[in-house]
Amino acid sequence: MLSYRHSFHAGNHADVLKHIVLMLILENLSLKEKGLYYLDTHSGVGRYRLSSNESEKTGEYKEGIGRLWERTDLPEEVARYVDLIKKLNYGGKELRYYAGSPMIAAQLLRSQDRALLTELHPSDFPLLRNNFKEFKNITTKSENGFQQLKATLPPKERRGLVLIDPPYELKEDYDLVVKAIEEGYKRFATGTYAIWYPVVLRQQTKRIFKGLEATGIRKILKIELAVRPDSDQRGMTASGMVVINPPWQLEQQMKSILPYLTQTLVPEGTGSWTVEWIVPE
């Protein structure tokens, strides 16, 4: 089943969190001159038009990137993220396009770096391929993203980031994430892994945490932003990133900017944030 289309949700509060974390990890990895490998398992199309029927139908971006777009008090890290989105809008004042994870990464990768973007959705993949055809160091494939950890790791660079952000349409995605991490870590224990997760039902989210704890892998950091308290009602109340082998700067960077993000993205006052170790060093 491949019904999920990210265009309905592009630029929402979950994307803001995910893409700031992604940016900070890649910035920190790029402090070393040596090239790195970036794998994006569920790439989507890479770029989204916010005037599309899908985006306009939900309007989710208005409560995400839309709440940061014209702010003049952005913390330094958040300002760098907004600048990446402004580049995609040709520096204009109007917010017309939003970057998916692949486009965020493409703006940060250097000539010595390499990326693989995978997407299985038959409507999304041709758009993804077209959006990245000019990037010589980026490869796109219409393949199962979970399987790429086993197929492509370890990378020749021996440095890199794997982003796993499935739609969680199917309940087994929660288990497939853990299995993919096990396969990847077995081959590439020094790599950084970032897993995006939604909080729709808290017990589903805990399956990922418990599954990762059971692997015996160390250095697992959880970063979460909630827009309202957990609920049995339908809808996503929070989202987060689990980062394995995070750059040492990441924990403090997120602790410093999450109070601002929570206050700005959730002005109603129902938001909260968490940065904590699921498994320490």
Regions found by a protein language model. Give the residues of each.
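Class I S-adenosyl-L-methionine-dependent methyltransferase catalytic core
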Residues: M1-E281
